[in-house]
Amino acid sequence: MKIGFIGLGNMGASLAKAVLQAKTGAQILLANRSQAKVDAFIADFGGQASSNEEIFAEADVIFLGVKPAQFSELLSQYQTILKKRESLLLISMAAGLTLEKLASLLPSQHRIIRMMPNTPASIGQGVISYALSSNCRAEDSELFCQLLTKAGLLVELGEGLIDAATGLAGCGPAFVYLFIEALADAGVQTGLPRETALKMAAQTVVGAGQLVLESQQHPGVLKDQVCSPGGSTIAGVASLEAHAFRGTVMDAVTKAYKRTKKLGK
């Protein structure tokens, strides 16, 4: 089997790395506008340098890591090749581009998976939501999960929920990074060294998230366990509530969701 990656930006490179780590035995073909980026990736992780044309002509599975605005131009350049190929599995990570839109850019025989990864996939801790086109085969989902087993949590959704998953998990790391930065800044403000504060803030978020997953308790229950009557934690929680912390986070996710939907139009 040949698996092609067109576009080695942050997400494309992260997923290519995960596929290589899965050790499926497939031949991994890599193409990017910057050849230097391809060469650097191969030096670090492996794979084989290729071209867009070669990938469209030879690969059985193609990951498309290009921006939404570039999709139409990219696929139109290789329509002749795509029309001659038997059914391929094409995997899009472009925010907002629906399966219907993607299908309109491709010959009808090709199957499509629309996915939305996030950046922690680069260390195997990502969240990857995905939806399959109606002509996908039963084994396509299994193959997709096999290829990306090293990338993190894989969640199959109805396509109507992919934009919502993008707002939450696709954009969510940026919101969490802001929170970590704010925690660290507060630590510095109260006397901690910067490096120490940053490590403590990041580990606090990692540990709290892991406890939610492993304990299977509601976050509100875990929060209450930390808040003793009249104590320091409840004083901090009260300040967050007074400044609409939860509402602000919900609004950020909702705005990201709405923006994602606009990107596909």
Regions found by a protein language model. Name each.
Residues 1-57, 125-126, 188-189:
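NAD(P)+-binding Rossmann beta1-loop-alpha1 motif at the extreme N-terminus of oxidoreductases
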